[in-house]
C-alpha cells in the first residue's frame, strides 16, 4: 500500500481560534450574540505561533444596521484593550498600513480600511491637534504589482517618519467555511502577509521594525481543501440529523433545515461504512490527504463568496470607523 508522507504538508490557518487554543484562553464572553475570545500565548506554546495577545471576535452578520452597530461597539472595545496590552500611550504616533492587493477584491480589505481613516500627521507637523492622535497611512500594495517587498517599503517609511507603533490590516485565509467574513482577529504579534495561502512574504513585526505591530485581519478566502473537507463533514452531520429526526419515513426530505448547529454526528463505524477508510481519518489528516490530491495538479484553488465586493466594503467601513474612535478622543 502506498504510504503518504504527511509531515511535509503544513496546512495552516491564520486564525488562532482555529488552532488548539483552549489551554491559553484567558477570557471568553458573549454580548449581543457576538463571541469574544482572548488568548495569550507564551514563547514556547505548542501552537507554534508567535508569543503575544490574540483577540477573536465572532459573529453571524454585519450587513444590517443593528448587527453592524453591535460589532462596531465590541471591536472598538477590543481595540482599546489591545492598545492597553501593548502599552500604547495616548500621544504615541501610529502608522496604519493597508496590506494586500487592491486589484483583487478578497485581498483589498486593507485598501478599503484606509479610505476612511482620519489622517492627521500633516496637521501635527504644523501644530498639535487637540483630541486627535498623530496618524499616517500607507498602502504598500503587493510584490507582483510594485516589484518591491511590502516589508522593504514599510521599513523605509518607518525609518523616515518614525511612528511609535504600527497597525496593519490584511485579509486572512480561514480553515473552515463558517469562519469566512464572520470573524475579526486582533493581535499584537505582527503579521506575515500571504502566509495563509502559502505565499509567504517578509513578516511585519516588532522583531523586524523595532516598534509594536498590531494586526487586524478578516478571513475572506478558503482553499479547495477546506471546501472538500467541510462538505464531507456536512454530509455526515446531515445524514445524522435526518436519521435522528426520522426523515427516512417521509416522502420528501426538507432540504432547507439547518443541521449545522446539531451536536450529534455519525459514529466512527457509521462514517467508515459511508466513506470507507476516509471516514476514519481525523480532520487534520484528511485535510493533508486532500492537499496531496489537489496541490500537485494545480486544483487547490483559493475561493471566496459571491458577495465579497459588498462584504469587503462593509468590513472596510467597520474597521476604519472603529480605528477612528479608538485611536482618537472622539
Feature annotation, model-predicted:
Residues 58-60, 93-104, 137-141:
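Short glycine-rich or small-residue beta-strand-to-loop segments that form or flank ligand, phosphate
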Residues 42-89:
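An N-terminal, well-structured beta->alpha segment
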Residues 1-51:
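N-terminal amphipathic/basic leader segments beginning at the initiator methionine
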Residues 109-143:
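Anionic-ligand anchoring segments at beta-strand to alpha-helix junctions in alpha/beta enzyme folds, i.e.
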Residues 138-139, 168-328:
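A structural signal for small-residue-enriched, beta-sheet-centric alpha/beta enzyme cores
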Residues 78-81, 105-122, 183-192:
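A glycine- and small-aliphatic-rich helix-loop capping segment at beta-alpha/alpha-beta transitions
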Residues 130-158, 162:
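A structural-propensity feature for long, helix-poor, extended segments
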